[in-house]
């Protein structure tokens, strides 16, 4: 992705999107992102909505996933992991900006920092252009037009 392979010419960015972890409406949490090789910019399109971790991460039943509870139980011995989990559960801002060279773990949101406003605006504009070009015009996954299969 950003390794030693030759750079593809005439491409300055990688774009991505996420709409939902699962079909359950409460798991819809769309975001769009752009990466220029160093800075990773994210827009959380429904940031005002309460963010809920996907059920298969939080609930042990059905999936046998014990990592959520284990992280809570290890609060004193693994405070970094515990704080990250709590940060995830507290919701996300509309904009996030990370310096992947200096913060590959994406721990420090730099969105709005004065020294990076120009970079943030560059990425924001490029992301907006990409969304227009790909006809990605809605923020709520329920409003995305999908093909309907007609019963015969």
Residue ranges of each PLM-predicted region?
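C-terminal cap/loop subdomain of S1 sulfatases and analogous C-terminal strand-loop tails that border
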Residues: 1-96, 151
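Long, internal low-complexity/basic segments
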Residues: 75-95, 100-152
């Amino acid at each position: 992705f950003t390794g030693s392979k030759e750079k593809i010419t005439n491409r300055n960015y990688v774009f991505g999107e996420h709409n939902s972890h699962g079909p359950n409406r409460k798991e819809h949490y769309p975001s769009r992102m752009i990466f220029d090789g160093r800075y990773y910019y994210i827009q959380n399109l429904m940031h005002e909505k309460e963010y809920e971790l996907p059920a298969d991460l939080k609930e042990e039943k059905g999936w046998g996933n014990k990592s959520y509870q284990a992280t809570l139980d290890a609060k004193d011995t693994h405070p970094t992991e515990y704080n990250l989990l709590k940060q995830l559960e507290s919701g996300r801002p509309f904009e996030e900006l990370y310096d992947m060279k200096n913060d590959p773990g994406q721990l420090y949101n730099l969105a709005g920092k004065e020294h990076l406003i120009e970079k943030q605006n560059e990425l924001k504009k490029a992301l907006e252009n990409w969304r227009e070009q790909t006809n990605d015009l809605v923020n709520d996954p329920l409003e995305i037009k999908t093909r309907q299969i007609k019963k015969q």
